[in-house]
Amino acid sequence: MDGLAFSVSVHGHRPVVVRLLGELDLAAAPRLQSALAGLDGDVELDCSGLQFIDAAGLAALLEAQKACAAGGWRLVLVDPGPAVDRLLRLVELDTVLLIRRNGRAS
C-alpha cells in the first residue's frame, strides 16, 4: 500500500480511535496532524496496520502527544507492528509515548 489511510471512530465518552493503515511518512504526516488537531479527548492510535514510519511520521506522533497532553488528554499507540515497534524502541520514543502492546501498556 502506498501512502496512509486512516479512519476515525468516535463513541461517546470513550477514547477516539484512529486506525492507521499503510505508511506514515513525510507526505502523510500533515494529513494525520490535521485530522488529530480537530479531536477532543483521549485518542488511541491503532497502529496494527501501520507498515512504515519515517522521521516525519515520528514527529507527527510527538506533536499529537504534546497536543493531547496540553488539553489534559492521553494519546496511546496501540499494537504497533514489529517494524514500527522496533523503530520506536531504537529512537527511545517508547520512553516518551504511551504504547499498548497486545492489551498491555508500557
Residue ranges and their predicted role:
Residues 1-52, 62-106:
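STAS-like cytosolic regulatory interaction modules
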